[in-house]
Amino acid sequence: MKRIIALLFFFLIAFGYSLSPEEEKQLIRDIAEIKATLKTFMEQTDKRFQDLNQRINELREDMNKRFEQVDKRFEQVDKRFEQINNELNRLIQIMVGIFAGQIALVAAVIGFAWWDRRTIIRKSKEETFEEMEKELRPEKFKKLLNALREKAKTDKELEAILKKYGLL
């Protein structure tokens, strides 16, 4: 553009002094033609720049829309992660509850078995002592000792044992 203006200026200076009236008219027509061409060129250039600016603005708007869509998608993904995290926490709480229940059940069974064992052993001891008392009454013991003494009369080995313990 500067070149065209400089060229036009050069022609005006160079031919301004020695032109005839007809050449001058021709020069003015040429200059007018150049101006018209230049004006057309400028208008076309302006239109191209406007079109380019419009395309850039459209691309920018499209990019902004896409970024908004991506942001919305990230928000959805974040919400989904929160939901999954909440579900996992709930599942962990349920599992801890089940585990604690099982531990309590095992502790109750062990406690019951220990209590039952002590009760049964105590009853067994009492029953055993009662049976022993029934079986080892003094009169039965005397009868047993008399029977052993009778047998010791015929059995020398038994006689030695009873003497050793002072029962003969």
Swiss-Prot record:
Transmembrane segments annotated in the record for this chain: 4-24, 94-114
Keywords: Cell membrane, Membrane, Transmembrane, Transmembrane helix
Its membrane topology: Multi-pass membrane protein
Magnesium is among the record's keywords: no
Localization terms from the record: Cell membrane
GO CC annotation terms, alphabetical: plasma membrane
Principal cellular location given in the protein's record: membrane
Keyword match Membrane: yes
Family indicated by similarity: To A.aeolicus aq_1446.
Protein's name according to its UniProt entry: Uncharacterized protein aq_1900
